[in-house]
Amino acid sequence: EKIDEIVRILHNEAERYKTKDRLSYYVQSVNQGKRAALARGAEVAKHELVVFVDSDSFLDPFAIRNLVQPFVDLKMGGVAGRTDVANTYTNSLTKMQSVRYYISFRIMKAAEAYFDAVSCLSGPLSCYRKEIVLEHKEEWLNQTFFGQKATFGDDRSMTNFVLKNHRTNYQDTAVCSTIVPNEYPVFLKQQMRWKRSWLRESLMAGSFIWRKEPFVSVMFYIGLVVPILAPVVVIYNLIYIPIVHRVFPTTFLVGLLMMALMMSVVQLILRKSSTWVFGLVFCLYYEAVLLWQMPIAWVTFWKSTWGTRETPQDIEEKRKKEEQRQRKAVRLEEQSEQE
């Protein structure tokens, strides 16, 4: 209903843009999830490029115009735009995420783009060649992992289909902003979901990334192994070494501090932002909290529940837990009667 209202306003107030001829919206008869909605959009699209955006993305007026520029290269299969944080100054959590987004997009994705091998065309704003999306549509919609239907991680999954045989890039001038979680429970659920999808899709990408430019391949495999082994490395340096060898982990702590300072210095020099100190805070928070989500992701990466919204998989998971709770209650009641 809200979309319908917005479209009517556009038709009435933006007549010179001919929105009646250029803008259409479709409502799925049944809520089949985000992937199905994106696939439907690709099916009805009239031109050779399709743009995917998240429902909480705010696009710069020239975002799409800038986003499509790299497609002058006929081998280019997909391009990611830049995502900034819209609610940076809400609290310390959003400030930390703002620092992380800056590093993730303007440093890491920009580096990958140098080799035309961006590993994740992020959901807030990305563009694909329609023919590639339609070619892999059925595989994408019906993707399973360890027998479980894949729901989240649709951006990484589609990126893998594209990256396998095409180039992927990052366009820094195609800017959008997004609302990030400002409460820790929601944030932690989001991070767990992202880690599971990262692990799943990184394992998939590992089967073909070796065919890319050698430097890209080496950095990809290092980037895959290091986060997986990071909890072991931390335990070894902060617990095993001090207890067994009675040596203070100076080298490890100095390295951690230098990494945190690098994030802060980048914010201070390149962005000239007052949030620069939260680069240091984020690194410490990552080591203390987020790092320990990875072992959980190892043993639950097959799970497809969203965590922060009600998907069919979340509803099914709740139903199973409720059934288990009821069975346990019945057993306890039977035991009490026997006593």
Residue ranges and their predicted role:
Residues 1-209, 337-339:
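Non-transmembrane catalytic domains and loops of membrane-associated enzymes and transporters
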Residues 101-110, 130-134, 171-179, 219-234, ...:
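A broadly tuned preference for mixed-charge, low-complexity surface segments
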Residues 145-146, 212-222:
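Membrane-water interface at loop-to-transmembrane-helix junctions
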Residues 180, 184-187, 195, 214, ...:
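Hydrophobic alpha-helical segments and helix-packing faces
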Residues 187, 194, 303-309, 313:
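Tryptophan-centered motif/residue detector
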Residues 204-216, 232-235:
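Membrane-helix boundary elements
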Residues 220-305:
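Membrane-embedded multi-pass helical conduit in multi-pass membrane proteins
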Residues 307-338:
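Cytosolic juxtamembrane C-terminal amphipathic helix followed by a basic/polar low-complexity tail immediately after
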